[in-house]
């Protein structure tokens, strides 16, 4: 599963809508990834979609 580095997240929301597993949601003013839903997009995409769309490098990282 992946996680979002809260201190780097700009709360743009791009990742929430790109996640094919609906694993990303807003909690207490920032986005979080539900590890029980995150599959790292294996079998669906070449790399995790949160990583692909995030405008800030190294914000969506392996947990």
From Swiss-Prot:
Q: Quick check: keyword Cell cycle in the entry?
A: no
Q: Which cysteines are joined by disulfide bonds?
A: none
**Which residues of the sequence carry a binding annotation for [4Fe-4S] cluster 1?**
9, 12, 15, 19
List, for all copies, the residue spans of the domain called 4Fe-4S ferredoxin-type. 2-29
Gene3D superfamilies in alphabetical order: 3.30.70.20
Cofactor info, note text? Binds 2 [4Fe-4S] clusters.
The entry's [4Fe-4S] cluster 2-binding residues are: 38, 41, 50, 54
- What SUPFAM superfamilies does UniProt report for this protein, alphabetically? 4Fe-4S ferredoxins
Q: Which cofactor does it need?
A: [4Fe-4S] cluster
- What PROSITE patterns does the record tag this protein with? 4FE4S_FER_1 (PS00198), 4FE4S_FER_2 (PS51379)
Task: Name the domain of life.
Answer: Bacteria
- Name the keywords, alphabetized: 4Fe-4S, Electron transport, Iron, Iron-sulfur, Metal-binding, Repeat, Transport
tRNA processing among keywords: no
Q: Which InterPro entries match?
A: 4Fe4S_Fe-S-bd, 4Fe4S_Fe_S_CS
Gene Ontology terms for molecular function: 4 iron, 4 sulfur cluster binding; metal ion binding
Function comment = Ferredoxins are iron-sulfur proteins that transfer electrons in a wide variety of metabolic reactions.
> What is this protein's name?
Ferredoxin-1
Q: What organism does this protein naturally occur in?
A: Rhodopseudomonas palustris (strain ATCC BAA-98 / CGA009)
């Amino acid at each position: 599963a992946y996680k979002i580095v809260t201190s780097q997240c700009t709360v743009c929301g791009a990742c929430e809508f790109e996640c094919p597993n609906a694993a990303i949601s807003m909690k207490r003013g920032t986005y979080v990834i539900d590890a029980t839903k995150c599959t790292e997009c294996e079998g669906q995409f070449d790399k995790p979609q949160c990583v692909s769309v995030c405008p800030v490098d190294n914000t969506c990282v392996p947990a």
